[in-house]
């Protein structure tokens, strides 16, 4: 392809993303776009084509961003190259959205005609506005009887400030409005800027590990071009590799001779060491490097921490390898080795939220065939020591002695809860119960309210989302952002089994709720810890003070079965012998803590844990 043809190709490239709140139908709309551009043969078509992870299909949600190249012949007779990047809608995966948008010039804002603008719609739109993208509003699901497109148009204008007079009315199910969407992408989304002859600058927005090809880099080329045989250099560490293959996803991998300005594709270069690459790095050519790297991504900070341990300790290295490979594909995951007396060697992992944690555990167990135990989640706590020093901990087991602590601070979030008017009461009640502090309440229209609360993050990560959905019949939507740390009256609660503290079961709780939480944990453990030959006392303690206790009764063999009548002293002797044996067994016996015990604490029910 000569210079002129390349410049003409650049003019015909359109890069766009689809952003929406969870369940507003963006993956279905993406299916219709793939169908209409003949990217996928009718016989290969299936629901949510771009959600190619088994886990995504099962849960019906998008977890990973996905890039795909389409070819569309517009009404003006010219063929355009579209790069569509499908994004997740859940608050835990907003980092995936921000990375997708950095690779685009435009975005389709999809809003459900029956639900209207929701919390995550707003959060994602602001990301797109920050990146200065051209936004095309699409009102989806207009074929439903309960659709209110005019009301939704008003909401888009009032809440987001976008002109929605020419918003496209569409249905991902029937395909209505999809041809109009494609035409608007051609006319409204600008072609990528960038100099074809400048030194190569390509932004790594995702990566994945392939057993045969090594690390596969997903890139958006911002300047210059790259082809097979070129020697590339990673600008963060100066490492050099020879390109073995370049191509695009359509939606399966299609090899190409080169990638140029505006292209969204992949590069393989026999990169075998996972640590050499990171998302947000810039790829350039070794013999003609760019002067400075592209603006990468802000460092993402995990919000929730949990211990991850292999059931079989011999699998520790397998778990490390699996986490390293997964981290390539999930840039928000953080981990470091840790040791637990109860569970052996494992890793302390940082996640963006509870769904992210759940998804990581499931991907590790499925894709890497590991059996794992996950401890109850915790957040970062700032501890001011009596000598004036500061310490940050994310593991209750690391909590210093009470005598050394001056104050403990915990992270707070500003939670924005959008809810129909009828459910404001239950939402406020739930937020107050979770130690929330009311900030303000805005009436969005006649039907819906945006309630804003300051809440401790530790209260949100357990079951706040589940409780919110059940108390509002599924109508509420939630978005939150960290606002800082505040001093709180927190204590460390230890769980003792057979008199020994189990470090993996320790939790940090608010003093006011310690008794109820301790009582509930002890009751839950009693039902999940299997009975032994000796009885097991389960205790919840703060310092040396036991605040709750229960006992798992022992199995007993009937030692009197062979005694038919006879002297009572004979029976007493047998019973005393059994008692002595049980006592000896108890002093040396160790208690196995099953995975269900950890999970039962993870999903503590609100009525138990905070004594409604």
UniProtKB/Swiss-Prot annotation:
| Origin superkingdom | Bacteria
Q: Name one GO biological process term.
A: positive regulation of translation
Residues covered by the tr-type G domain: 11-193
What GO terms fall under cellular component here?
plasma membrane
Keywords, A to Z, come to:
Cell membrane, GTP-binding, Hydrolase, Membrane, Nucleotide-binding, Protein biosynthesis
Q: Does the keyword Zinc apply?
A: no
Query: Topology relative to the membrane, per the entry?
Result: Peripheral membrane protein
Gene Ontology terms, MF aspect: GTP binding; GTPase activity; ribosome binding; translation elongation factor activity
Protein family per UniProt? Belongs to the TRAFAC class translation factor GTPase superfamily. Classic translation factor GTPase family. LepA subfamily.
Indicate what this protein is called per its UniProt record.
Elongation factor 4
- The organism encoding this protein is Lacticaseibacillus paracasei (strain ATCC 334 / BCRC 17002 / CCUG 31169 / CIP 107868 / KCTC 3260 / NRRL B-441) (Lactobacillus paracasei)
Q: Which gene encodes it?
A: lepA
């Amino acid at each position: 392809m000569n210079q002129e043809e390349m410049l003409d190709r650049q003019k015909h490239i359109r890069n766009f993303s689809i952003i929406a709140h969870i369940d507003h139908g963006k993956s279905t709309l993406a299916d219709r776009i793939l169908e209409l551009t003949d990217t996928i043969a009718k016989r290969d078509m299936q629901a949510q084509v771009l959600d190619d992870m088994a886990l995504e299909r099962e849960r019906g949600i998008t977890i990973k961003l996905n890039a795909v190249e389409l070819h569309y012949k517009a009404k003006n007779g010219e063929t355009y190259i579209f790069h569509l990047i499908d994004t997740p809608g859940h608050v835990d995966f907003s980092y995936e959205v921000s990375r997708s948008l950095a690779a685009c010039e435009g975005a389709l804002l999809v809003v459900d005609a029956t639900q209207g603008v929701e919390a995550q719609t707003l959060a994602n739109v602001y990301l797109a506005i920050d990146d200065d993208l051209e936004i095309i509003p699409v009102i989806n699901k207009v074929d439903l009887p309960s659709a209110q497109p005019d009301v939704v148009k008003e909401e888009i204008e009032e809440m987001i400030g976008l002109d929605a007079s020419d918003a496209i009315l569409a249905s991902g199910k029937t395909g209505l409005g999809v041809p109009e969407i494609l035409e608007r992408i051609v006319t409204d989304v600008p072609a990528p800027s960038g100099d074809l002859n400048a030194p190569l600058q390509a932004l790594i927005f995702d990566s994945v590990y392939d057993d045969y090809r090594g690390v596969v880099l997903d890139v958006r080329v911002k300047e210059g071009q790259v082809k097979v045989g070129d020697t590339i250099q990673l600008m963060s560490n100066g490492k050099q590799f020879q390109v073995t293959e370049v191509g695009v996803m359509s939606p399966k991998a299609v090899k190409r001779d080169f990638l140029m300005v505006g292209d969204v594709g992949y590069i393989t270069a026999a990169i075998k060491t996972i640590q050499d690459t990171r998302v947000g790095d810039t790829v350039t050519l070794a013999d003609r490097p760019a002067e400075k790297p592209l603006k990468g991504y802000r460092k993402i900070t995990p919000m929730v921490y949990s211990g991850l341990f292999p059931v079989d300790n011999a699998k520790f290295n397998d778990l490390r390898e699996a986490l390293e490979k997964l981290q390539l594909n999930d840039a928000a995951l953080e981990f470091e080795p840790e040791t637990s007396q109860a569970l052996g060697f494992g890793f302390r992992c940082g996640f963006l939220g509870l769904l992210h944690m759940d998804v990581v555990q499931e991907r590790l167990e499925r894709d890497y065939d590991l059996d794992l135990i996950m401890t109850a989640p915790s957040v970062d706590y700032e501890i001011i020591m009596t000598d004036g020093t500061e310490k940050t901990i994310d593991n209750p087991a690391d909590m210093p002695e009470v005598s050394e602590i001056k104050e403990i601070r915990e992270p707070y979030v500003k939670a924005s809860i959008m809810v129909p008017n009828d459910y404001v009461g239950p939402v406020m009640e739930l937020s107050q119960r979770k130690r929330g502090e009311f900030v303000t309440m805005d009436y969005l229209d006649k039907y819906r309210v945006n309630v804003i609360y300051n809440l401790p993050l530790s209260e949100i990560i357990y079951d706040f989302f589940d409780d919110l959905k059940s108390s509002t019949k599924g109508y509420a939507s939630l978005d939150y952002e960290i606002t800082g740390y505040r001093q709180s009256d927190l204590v460390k609660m230890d769980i003792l089994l057979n008199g020994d503290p189990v470090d993996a079961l320790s939790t940090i709780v608010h003093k006011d709720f310690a008794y109820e939480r301790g009582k509930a944990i002890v009751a839950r453990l009693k039902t999940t810890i299997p009975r032994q030959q000796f009885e097991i006392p389960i205790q919840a303690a703060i310092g040396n003070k036991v605040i709750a206790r229960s006992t798992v009764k022992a199995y007993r063999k009937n030692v009197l079965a062979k005694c038919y009548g006879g002297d009572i002293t004979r029976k007493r002797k047998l019973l005393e012998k059994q008692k002595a044996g049980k006592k000896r067994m108890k002093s040396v016996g160790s208690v196995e803590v099953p995975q269900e015990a950890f999970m039962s604490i993870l999903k503590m029910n609100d009525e138990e844990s905070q004594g409604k």
